[in-house]
Amino acid sequence: MLVVEGLTCRFGTKAAVDNASFSITPGGFVGVIGRSGAGKSTLLRMINRLAEPSEGRILFHDQDVTALQGQALRQWRARSAMIFQQFNLIGRLDVLTNVLMGRLAEIPSWRSLAQLWPEKDKALAMSALDQFDMAAYAAQRADQLSGGQQQRVAIARALVQQPDIVLADEPIASLDPRNTKIVMDALLRINKHFGITVICNLHSLDLARNYCDRLIGMASGRVVFDGAPEQLTDQIARELYDLEANEVMGAEHHVPGASSVPELAGAVAA
């Protein structure tokens, strides 16, 4: 189980994440929602330890993740694989090599520098690409792919890390509707077929409701909603997103004079 206890991250006097607490059982597909600047990305980066918490701690199966250093920290980052909005592929390298980068924590650095990847890792990478219909592109340069194809390669790279958790930070933010569905279906496959916990930052409420079995809503760095998608009423969503409600819900949902975020405090699950 992943447990977040009183997690806070401050930049100067501003708290990007403010006393966030929740627990996630293995195998869930959790959507983290909220307006821009709510603290969603910082939360995921702290779970992966790409950002350091100012206060609080993260536990995974009773291990204190916030105390990890050195090799133990590198192993945790492999077990909690990140997928980024920007794909983070190396454009000049072929697709297969980009996926193999997900095995860096498992091999000596001289092997990766010389690109002497073990055959079992190559087979694992090809299998991961095949899961997302990208095996035919294995020899192609990454910068020759479309955005949706690049994100599928990034998901395959995360899969070869053989993670316990996948942390997807706005993975479809720059994609068109067709590629958005393809990428979200790929994340759902990771979750349902492989049983990997997925925590995904999403701006679209429709996608969050359609794909996630639990939603965590953030506002001004705080967790202000935690529950099943069906518990997130349109009224709560309007309060959560405030001025961005039209964008994330569609014009047909807009009701003038929607309430402000502080009223959401009672929506957090006990």
From Swiss-Prot:
Subcellular location: Cell inner membrane
Function, in words: Part of the ABC transporter complex PhnCDE involved in phosphonates import. Responsible for energy coupling to the transport system.
UniProtKB keywords: ATP-binding, Cell inner membrane, Cell membrane, Membrane, Nucleotide-binding, Phosphonate transport, Translocase, Transport
Species whose genome carries this gene: Rhodopseudomonas palustris (strain BisA53)
A Pfam family of this chain: ABC_tran
Subunit structure: The complex is composed of two ATP-binding proteins (PhnC), two transmembrane proteins (PhnE) and a solute-binding protein (PhnD).
A cellular component annotation (GO) from this entry: plasma membrane
EC nos: 7.3.2.2
Name the record gives this protein: Phosphonates import ATP-binding protein PhnC 2
Gene (UniProt): phnC2
